[in-house]
């Protein structure tokens, strides 16, 4: 019987538009990503689909196209929220790989240590770790 949701995916799985399959290398260096599916390319070599795993989560990548554009001049439409056992090490690795700091990694009033980065493809990533339980 065919499963409507593949075992390795969840009800919501992010799919990021990137310039090409070379993005896999950045995500491997920045976040320890592993490629878990072969690259599916179109007739002209453009990236159609690939899947990577970061920690326990799958992220799909697709090539940039007119169908995968944010509204001109509008705010970002999504931010990747990630949690790490060692957020400081994850942060340093991502910055060393070329991620741009949007706001620095620091202890937050809501009980997390976190900050926000932008990858070379324009996607924003929050890196966090819960450091204390706080009632909000």
Where are these regions (language model features)?
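Vicinal oxygen chelate
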Residues: 1-17, 24-120, 127-136
């Amino acid at each position: 019987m065919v499963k409507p949701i593949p075992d390795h995916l969840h009800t919501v799985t992010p799919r990021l538009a990137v310039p090409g399959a070379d993005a896999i290398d950045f995500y491997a260096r920045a976040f320890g990503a592993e490629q878990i599916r072969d690259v599916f390319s179109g007739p002209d070599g453009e990236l159609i689909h690939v899947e990577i795993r970061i920690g326990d989560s799958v992220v799909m990548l697709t090539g940039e196209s007119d169908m995968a554009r944010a509204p001109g001049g509008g705010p970002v439409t999504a931010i990747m929220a990630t949690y790490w056992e060692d957020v400081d090490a994850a942060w340093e690795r991502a910055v060393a790989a070329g991620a741009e700091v949007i706001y620095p990694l620091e202890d937050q009033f809501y009980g997390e240590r976190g900050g926000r980065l932008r990858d070379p493809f324009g996607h924003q990533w929050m890196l966090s770790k819960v450091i204390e339980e706080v009632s909000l």
